[in-house]
């Protein structure tokens, strides 16, 4: 048994110790976990995750920039991930997805309540047995019952530093406020809109010469970069969720 990499963090405020260890060699999972349980204090949390490619399902509406970036990186090696399917509530992005020989499924929200539509979406997702669900500009507010089916497994990209500019037309809101930086936040989804544990953030500087459309173009670049960087860390099993925050080791 060989330790390839080991990273640790102590949160002195809460008295919590976090550790991520990469192992290689021949060992019995059950025996290793039993040995850990006997060595660790009562109440400790441990996971043993096998190496290998993770499966994701991507949810979309109409915007293509984040989806297109993930498709390109998955196809050409920028992300070691299997995209099992892309599911949308509109047909808009079907042609883009099918160019990469990935299944696109339409689960329309028309004629359904939020709860009904979320149940249909959840069933479509679960049919692919993904490790994670990625919201690539999926513009529907998820119900608590949907979120509960995928705890700490749903990753969203938000168009600002949270909780600023919640909702529609964020870059027009930013323009009206005369902001000097715009950014994006990738986070896990919880029951509170755009308030889940933050995984990754970034900003770019803008000035008074930027129109709302200029901000939108620049913001889309930040969004897709932040989402792919966050997903890279999640897929590598580097992200620990504790309370409403993350530790990345």
Description of each model-found segment:
Residues 5-249:
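One-carbon transfer enzymes
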